[in-house]
């Protein structure tokens, strides 16, 4: 990618044709002569390479499929031609739900755009529609930062958020893998996560597990962390975790793609707890174990 391409977004969304695409996604209007609206067969469409969503809830997809069976697809998906096929820029959930509904073809807005515009559009569309969980959104913002060398201010303008919001979101990527998994699965909220950033290493993971076990509010979490910090590492009120156990906990979380808690007893006995938030997530964990 050239420096001109890397700085492309700094010139504004219009330079990538994204203003027109956003309009098409919102109301399916045809922005210019390069845009075409037609029905495409399901099998000539493929998922977008730049889809930032890592999880799609099966129950929500089935609900959407039921809606499509009853009313059809009201809003076309947006695709771009890739060889003899079409790659999804926006609307992968609709495409997958259409397959569940038994449709053979779907309405699509076809727009020939560059890789640069495709990745940016996929990220922006998902962020603006709030389709992403906090970690997916942070990872998407990081890609805009890394792949296009955008500033936090440019990203904020592109996705319609404040600069502070973008910066705080990106900071979530510094969380431990197991803590990020807990946030993704809804066991922690953004307030808890921001407070946990004040801790590092296994202490952060310990605190996250205490938050869940005691059902602490964000304010209670902040007080706990402030107390730990003021008391120092020797505080009798702070539980300890063996660093080797903490490393194993992080390793298992990475391998399983889920938050893992290890509670190791004094006599060698303990518990291994794998956290999941839906039957779909459990199925994914079992697939990795098999």
Curated annotation (Swiss-Prot):
Keywords from the UniProt entry? Chromosome partition, DNA-binding
Could you tell me the gene encoding this protein?
parB
Transmembrane parts of this sequence: none
Q: Which organism is it from?
A: Coxiella burnetii (strain RSA 493 / Nine Mile phase I)
GO cellular component, alphabetical, reads: chromosome
Q: Which domain of life is it from?
A: Bacteria
What Gene Ontology biological process does one annotation of this record name? Answer: positive regulation of sporulation resulting in formation of a cellular spore
User: Mind telling me which CDD domains this protein's record contains?
Assistant: SPO0J_N
Short name of one Pfam family: ParB_dimer
Spell out the protein name for this chain: Probable chromosome-partitioning protein ParB
Q: Which family does it belong to?
A: Belongs to the ParB family.
- Give the Gene Ontology MF terms in alphabetical order: DNA binding
- Protein purpose: Involved in chromosome partition. Localize to both poles of the predivisional cell following completion of DNA replication. Binds to the DNA origin of replication.
For this protein, the record's InterPro entries field holds:
Chromosome_partition/occlusion (IPR050336), HTH_ParB/Spo0J (IPR041468), ParB/RepB/Spo0J (IPR004437), ParB/Sulfiredoxin_dom (IPR003115), ParB/Sulfiredoxin_sf (IPR036086), ParB_dimer_C (IPR057240)
